[in-house]
Regions:
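Short, extreme N-terminal segment that most often corresponds to the first beta-strand
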Residues: 1-29
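Low-complexity intrinsically disordered segments
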Residues: 35-235
């Protein structure tokens, strides 16, 4: 089954509040598919819109907690949204309830009575000029790291690092980022094909829920370590 993703900005106190979502976007509002590798490319509208949303909401330039959450991602406890056991009166068995799931919480934030929520419409209006901006650097304030976005190359599907770094749930559904690559694709016998782990596989999900910001100013990365992300062309 395919796994569907939503890009999400969390409130700075997201672990302590029952309403942790600051903003979220649906790929469908940008004519994109919801599977991770249907939109995780340089110059993609959905990714560009998310980066501009982060920039516009991050008014003090200290960064905001972010995640690219799939619908197969785990639900976990936070201080205000703990997991707990509840008896199912039909089965007479305890079930795990409650907890925090960013994908589900974002869905609730974006929708109101089957329509776009007022909050979502406000954000969409805030970032309506997203395609006029091209942020080149993504800074992780939690880990004191940064990554430079690869240059856009016409007619090439260059993987964008941000959705991969922020991914929660990758590897659990169709359309996810593949950690391995075939090194003898000319081999027609599938049983004889050989695979090796991609260099960028080490970064998958390592920034999920961390505090990030985006910028065009390389000077803003001073004091941060550049991660060893390799340019990767999917097609």
């Amino acid at each position: 089954m395919g796994q569907y993703y939503r890009c999400i900005v969390l409130k700075k106190d997201w672990k302590e509040t029952k309403k942790p979502i600051l903003a979220a976007l649906s790929p469908y509002d940008f004519d994109n598919g919801a599977k991770l590798m249907e939109h995780s490319y340089v110059s993609n509208d959905y990714v560009n819109a998310f980066m501009h949303m982060v920039h516009e909401l991050d008014t003090d330039r200290s960064g905001l907690p972010c995640v690219w959450c799939g619908d197969y991602a785990d639900t976990f406890s936070t201080e205000s949204l703990p997991l707990f056991k509840k008896m199912n009166t039909n089965t007479q068995k305890y079930e795990i309830c409650g907890g925090f799931n960013a994908y589900n919480e974002a869905g609730d934030w974006m929708n109101e009575d089957g329509e776009k929520s007022d909050e979502l419409n406000e954000v969409l209006n805030l970032i309506k000029d997203y395609n006029m901006h091209d942020y080149r650097y993504i800074i992780n304030h939690t880990k004191k790291e940064y990554v430079k976005v690869p240059e856009y190359e016409k007619d090439k599907w260059t993987v964008h690092p941000l959705p991969i770094l922020l991914a929660d749930g990758n590897g659990r559904g169709g359309g996810d980022y593949h950690n391995e690559i075939c090194i003898n694709p000319e081999e027609t016998n599938w049983g004889k094909r050989k695979y090796t782990k991609k260099h960028n596989a080490q970064f998958v999900g390592t920034w999920a829920y961390d505090t990030i910001s985006v910028t065009n100013n390389e000077a803003d990365t001073k004091g941060y370590k550049k991660i060893d992300w390799e340019d990767e062309i999917e097609f």
